[in-house]
């Protein structure tokens, strides 16, 4: 696309009051849930009255299958990078590559598949593509080779101390920083951040991980090893409820959970505007539930279900 590249700052709409007038949601599954977004995004555009007027889709993030630089979750999906990028470009949404492998070494930087992926996504002019990243080694490499990206500091760094978050927010390399979900309700410290730092905070809203988990970093490292095709033993989570897998109802009971009401009544009035929804490793039905809960007015949720999948001949059993 021709023309001047728009940065994420230019896509925001400050209202001049210190409060955020928009909440930007960063959604999972750029590759993994392409088919869902192919149906949902036209609906979001055509029937804007179904959705909260204070929210926008800030980005869709993910990684394709067999992505050596990937992290957080193992990527997937059957669509090409070109198709995934074209879909987000059609609707004016930033595409983010999740390249948050924490165990990369210098020899991994020459991976042909990952470099081609970056060449595809860095070509676009507007909106700008981003990279969610953990490794400083990869960050330096991408800055040198693909200067068109903006960067998001990954939650896989597990920044659980507020001083760590503050230091990360002050790094000029990052346009956004996703803190560990256990800092979500540290309102006294969050309220005291400078406005320019508040603009960079991207809260992880719907984490289901046990709030007291001490192995979160080990879990992410296990995913990084899997993406590197390591033969080391798998990590097995021993946290309470881990054997049940992800349940949105349990996530809502998590002390770090951020509800729609929290966003409207606490975070936006404090000047925060960026909210990440996790879910790349889940099923598309659950992703739809997230879209209904966070973006859709309650009275229109049935309309969205009907437009996407629900008809009078659908059998569940």
Stretches with model-predicted labels:
Residues 2-168, 173-317:
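Active-site pocket-lining/capping segments in soluble small-molecule metabolic enzymes
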């Amino acid at each position: 696309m021709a023309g001047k590249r728009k940065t994420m700052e230019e896509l925001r709409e400050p209202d001049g009051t210190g409060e955020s007038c928009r909440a930007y949601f960063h959604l999972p599954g750029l590759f993994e849930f392409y088919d869902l977004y192919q149906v949902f995004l036209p609906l979001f555009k055509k029937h804007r009255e179904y959705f909260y007027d204070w929210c926008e889709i800030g980005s869709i993030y993910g990684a394709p299958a067999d992505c050596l630089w990937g992290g957080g979750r193992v990527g997937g999906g059957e669509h090409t990078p070109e198709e995934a990028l074209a879909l987000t470009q059609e609707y004016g949404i930033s595409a983010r590559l999740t390249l948050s492998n924490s165990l990369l070494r210098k020899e991994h930087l020459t991976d042909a598949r990952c470099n081609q992926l970056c060449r595809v996504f860095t070509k676009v002019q507007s909106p700008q593509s981003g990279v969610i990243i953990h490794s400083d080694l990869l960050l330096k490499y991408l800055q040198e080779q693909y200067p068109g990206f903006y960067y998001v500091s990954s939650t896989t760094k597990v920044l659980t101390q507020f001083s760590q978050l503050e230091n990360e927010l002050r790094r000029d390399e990052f346009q956004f920083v996703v803190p560990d979900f256990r800092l979500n309700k540290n309102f006294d410290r969050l309220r005291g951040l400078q406005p320019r730092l508040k603009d960079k905070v991207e809260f992880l809203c719907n984490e289901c991980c046990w709030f007291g988990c001490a192995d979160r970093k080990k879990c992410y490292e296990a995913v990084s090893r899997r993406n590197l095709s390591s033969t080391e033993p798998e990590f097995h989570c021993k946290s309470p409820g881990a054997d049940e897998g992800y349940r949105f109802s349990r996530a809502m009971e998590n002390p770090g959970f951020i509800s729609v009401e929290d966003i409207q009544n606490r975070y936006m009035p404090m000047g925060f505007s960026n909210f990440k929804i996790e879910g790349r490793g889940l099923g598309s039905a659950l992703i739809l539930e997230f879209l209904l809960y966070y973006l859709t007015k309650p009275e229109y949720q049935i309309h969205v279900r009907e437009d996407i999948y629900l008809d009078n001949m659908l059998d569940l059993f």
